[in-house]
Amino acid sequence: VHELTPAIIREAAARALGEDRGPADITTMACVASEVRAEARIFAKEACVLAGLPVAEQVFREQDPGLRLESAARDGALLHPGDTALKISGSAASILTAERCALNFIQQLSGVATRTRLFVDAVAGTSCQILDTRKTVPGLRALQKYAVRCGGGTNHRFGLYDMFLLKDNHLALMGPGATLADAVGAARSLKPEARVEVEVDRLDQIAEVLTLQVDQILLDNMTLEQMRDAVSLIAGRAKTEASGNMTLERVRDVAATGVDFISVGALTHSVRAIDFSLEMLV
């Protein structure tokens, strides 16, 4: 598991706030005196799984270390409409300047966590785990994968460096006469401690893969019947992952085939933001 470290949080908050604020928040400078004090809260306007609160808090700290922050919930918690996530007090100008950036993080990451929880709940009672993918917003992978965990999902490989995933293009570009055994052997030699996964899209490919003692087999765009047959053929000799067009409507049926994992790109690549708002209390 790749933890969401304080360094990652600080970097993300500073980069995002700098992008939004630029040299100065000119509207707030023109309208709000620096000595004005205020209290505010960030609250959910719809039911959701909260994620991104530590990043939102860091945005406020980055803008003004003198702001007082009081968390009213923790990431991973289920919020109902009207529930408070965070209370902020101090300089009114600082609160206004940091507001949008802080909300952006909470809205986007809570969207990921909430979407993930829907998929996790859909396969409840089976042994199947919901995986994320590398289909993340550039620059936000650590945050999005953290949000997947907040929603009860499991992280797949974090990047191209921590797990092998051999696909047909890799084999085709190895050179004339290269075999799957050659590819697996090269992977084992390069990084023996890393897990090796091989993608298949036909049942007749499985027998050869099993002779190579790989860790995981990705079943790409197979029908439910093909997945059931694949799980039977593999018989626990490797972990199984179903991938391709995974929707909430069919994910339960896919889990029922007996696969160990279902990877869902939609957890991160096209998530709807959750509606949060900041309300000034004073």
Go through the PLM ranges and name each one.
Residues 248:
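Cys/His-rich Zn2+-binding cysteine-cluster or related metal-binding knuckle/ribbon modules and their
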Residues 1-201, 205-212, 216, 225-233, ...:
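Acidic/glycine-rich phosphate/pyrophosphate-binding loops and surrounding catalytic core
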Residues 237-238, 282:
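Short alpha-helix boundary/capping motifs
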Residues 221, 244, 266-267:
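Short secondary-structure boundary segments
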Residues 266-282:
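Short, charged, intrinsically disordered terminal tails
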